[in-house]
């Protein structure tokens, strides 16, 4: 039985989690009864072949999709019971996202891209500007605030994406192939940034297909055919 302290330390918990997609007369079980707990301050890598369920799991963890059945507890809240609007707000307040393709808005400056989550949270412009400048400096882009994504290198764009993910000060960062579009040296720099964020208390869950990248995490979860094959 979990103690209260252990329960408080659980930031994400999937219980008997299924995600089933109809495929003609058949069904595909992208998640097939998954049970896993991610604790506060942990750093996880999720690995698996194409079709293993790792991307589906990240979509569920990011509140971008819903379970077919089972429970998803996020910071103690059963998000599987929330309506769409409540789920969107919960996602905005509790999660930060880092994508392989950066997902920056090309028409906006670095500063405006970083500010986007704050806009949706209703921050005023002065507070948003101060927060975005602080984050840009923290990721080494204080002199690039007025640049647009097309004027940046891949590594710089991923730094902007990390700053944007941190804008709402989430406790959990979800990183989907964060080094996938970067050269080796730049990828290592991004991983070092994630490790530093983890040392400062952020919980990080990262999907990667690169074993050498996964080895930077404290735990590695291997998916196969919609189930957890093993955890190292």
Question: Model segments located where?
Answer:
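ABC-family P-loop ATPase nucleotide-binding domain
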Residues: 1-20, 229-232
């Amino acid at each position: 039985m979990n103690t209260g302290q252990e329960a408080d330390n659980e930031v994400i918990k999937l219980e008997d989690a299924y995600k089933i997609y109809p495929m003609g007369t058949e069904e595909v079980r992208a998640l097939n009864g998954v049970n896993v707990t991610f604790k506060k301050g942990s750093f996880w890598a999720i690995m698996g072949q194409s079709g293993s369920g790792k991307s589906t799991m990240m979509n569920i963890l990011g509140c971008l999709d819903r379970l077919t059945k089972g429970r998803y507890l996020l910071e103690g809240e059963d998000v599987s019971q929330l309506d769409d609007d409540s789920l969107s707000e919960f996602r905005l307040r509790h999660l930060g996202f880092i994508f392989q393709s950066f997902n920056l808005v090309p028409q906006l400056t670095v500063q405006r891209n970083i500010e986007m989550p704050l806009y949706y949270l209703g921050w005023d412009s002065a507070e948003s500007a101060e927060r975005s400048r602080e984050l840009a400096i923290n990721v080494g882009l204080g002199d690039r605030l007025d640049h647009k994504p097309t004027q940046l290198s891949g590594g710089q764009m991923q730094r902007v994406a990390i700053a944007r993910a941190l804008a709402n000060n989430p406790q959990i960062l979800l990183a989907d192939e964060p080094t996938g579009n970067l050269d080796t040296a730049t990828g290592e720099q991004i991983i070092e940034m994630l490790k530093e964020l983890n040392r400062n208390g952020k919980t990080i869950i990262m999907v990667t297909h690169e074993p050498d990248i996964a080895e930077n995490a404290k735990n590695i979860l291997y998916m196969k055919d919609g189930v957890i094959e093993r955890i190292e």
